[in-house]
A protein has these predicted regions:
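Selective recognition of specific alpha-helical transmembrane segments in multi-pass small-molecule
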Residues: 60-75, 184, 234, 260-288
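Juxtamembrane transmembrane-helix boundary signature
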Residues: 34, 61-92, 103-117
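Transmembrane alpha-helical segments of multi-pass small-molecule transport proteins
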Residues: 104, 131-160, 176-182, 363-381, ...
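Hydrophobic transmembrane alpha-helices that form the core helical bundles
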Residues: 100-135, 336-355, 389-390, 442
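Hydrophobic alpha-helical segments and their helix-loop junctions in multi-pass secondary transporters
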Residues: 176-214, 226, 232-243, 409-420, ...
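Hydrophobic, small-residue-rich membrane helices and short re-entrant helix-turn-helix hairpins
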Residues: 45-51, 166-169, 215, 237-273, ...
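Extracellular loop-to-transmembrane helix junctions
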Residues: 49-74, 97-99, 401
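Flexible loop linkers connecting adjacent transmembrane helices
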Residues: 6-14, 46-51, 74-99, 124-134, ...
Length: 454
């Protein structure tokens, strides 16, 4: 009997016995899966570089989108759990196939780019863990290919053969580790009272002026960084997929209230806290330190020049000293891993639902497992073709995410007010938040498009 117990005990069960880890076990669920997936390379890049480049000026964006995310995702959860239908099936049958394809096609293309950016972050993180940068130009060769293949195989194997519940638990554990790293640095930065004054100023909505990248002819755009933060917070694929996740996790109508509070815990508190502390860490440990007259690392002496993972890893310097770049690089591997899996899971739901196939993640659903693996493997293996620093790739992917966000929010607003939801239809307060979210996203998209032609 003792032997049997030892054999069947899962790694998650062992972790749950460690101090503090068990306290967070109750957070596991689709909200934790989504939160962990949203604390990926895109989240780190958009917020850390916002803090590094613009100080606290963009803190308001990261903070104000939190309630938008919570209410939008909880509304999507209601729709999925009560109807038991996939979002794309509902769009096809209740509105029209034309709209389903209008959303699906660009979502597919954007998420190929997102997954490429996540694998690039993992590869650059792997090199950064050894204190180097990936080879570029003519130096790119077999070594880069081997690292990419190994990381791709490890990610696909862990995701596909672990099962849905195991994926949830892996995501939750990684979520907590990544969050803890940044909290330490942010707390140290907040010990200076002047930091609080600057932080307060960052709560006032503003678009900081563009800054010139020292030593080059390039600039960093404050508005583009706003688009990137909002695009990472309101990705249409995550918003539309949340109902699938809630249904797949076994939620029932009676679980909706408890599920709402889990969403508040995971997205409102943990992910929201992450968003704030990463900007605080970037502002205090990078923006205030790399001023051009201070330290130099990999040839970078000014905050405007920061764009590679090892240099950005200096953000953990106040807590970890010389180990900071290596530890940060390992964290980026974990962050890229979570989002790569989360996005692949989301797109597998969408593809199977569009094809009218079973979209539930079970060990018996072989088409799901095959497509899930392909969504990890194909973008990951072609990632080296795109030659940009990984953090800049992530920012570009997040900006692309925002384009369909207004449509996704409006669809959720439509379905959460349908008579089929009965007593769980949205009330005035929820509709107000969803309406503000749609207008906020639409305003950013319109201004972004206008900026391209003016």
């Amino acid at each position: 009997m003792a032997t049997a117990l030892t054999v069947t005990r899962s790694p998650a069960a062992v972790l749950a016995r460690l101090p503090l880890v068990g306290v967070f076990a109750r957070l596991v669920g689709p909200a934790a899966l989504t939160a962990a997936g949203m604390i990926g390379a895109g989240a780190v890049a958009t917020r850390l570089l916002a803090g590094a480049w613009f100080g606290f000026d963009l803190l308001w964006v990261a903070l104000y989108v939190v309630p938008m995310v919570v209410f939008t995702l909880d509304s999507a959860s209601r729709v999925g759990v009560i109807t038991g239908r996939g979002m794309f099936e509902m769009i096809r049958s209740d509105i029209g196939a034309w709209l389903a394809w209008f959303i699906f096609a660009p979502t597919l293309l954007v998420n190929v780019i997102v997954n490429m950016s996540q694998m690039s972050a993992m590869v650059e993180g792997a090199y950064g863990a050894f204190g180097t940068l990936p080879p570029v130009g003519a130096d790119r060769g077999a070594g880069l290919v081997v690292v990419t293949v190994v990381l791709t195989a490890a990610t696909a194997g862990a995701a596909v053969f672990g099962g849905y519940k195991r994926v949830e638990k892996i995501m939750t554990a990684l979520l907590l580790v990544i969050l803890a790293c940044f909290i330490v640095v942010a707390i140290k930065g907040l010990l200076d009272w002047q930091t609080w004054v600057a932080l307060g100023g960052g709560l006032v909505p503003q678009i900081p002026p563009d800054i010139a990248v020292v030593g080059t002819g390039r600039t960093r755009s404050g508005f583009m960084q706003v688009l990137a933060i909002a695009g990472q917070a309101l990705p249409p694929s995550v918003l539309l997929a949340y109902g699938y996740l809630a249904t797949n996790s076994g939620q029932r109508v009676g679980d909706l209230k408890a599920a709402y509070w889990k969403t508040v815990q995971n997205l409102g508190v943990i992910w929201g806290l992450f968003s704030v502390v990463v900007i605080v860490a970037g502002a205090t440990a990078l923006h205030a330190v790399y001023t051009g007259s201070g330290p130099t690392y990999f040839g970078v002496s000014h905050y405007s020049q920061i764009e590679s993972i090892p240099v950005a890893g200096q953000v953990l310097g106040p807590a970890l000293g010389f180990l900071a770049p290596r530890f940060f690089s390992l964290g980026l591997i974990a962050a890229g891993f979570t989002t790569l899996i989360s996005v692949s899971l989301t797109m597998t739901y969408f593809c199977l639902d569009m094809a009218g196939r079973d979209w539930r993640f079970t060990r018996e659903n072989r088409p799901f497992q095959l497509l899930f693996a392909l969504w990890i493997v194909v973008p990951a293996l072609i990632a080296p073709i795109w030659q940009l620093p990984a953090l800049l790739k992530a920012i570009i992917a997040m900006i692309g995410n925002l384009v369909l966000a207004p449509v996704a929010v409006l669809l959720i607003l439509y379905f959460v007010n349908r008579p089929a939801l009965g007593e769980h239809r949205a009330g005035a307060g929820r509709n107000l938040v969803l309406g503000i979210t749609a207008l906020f996203a639409l305003g950013l998209v319109v201004n972004g498009i206008r900026g391209l032609f003016l």
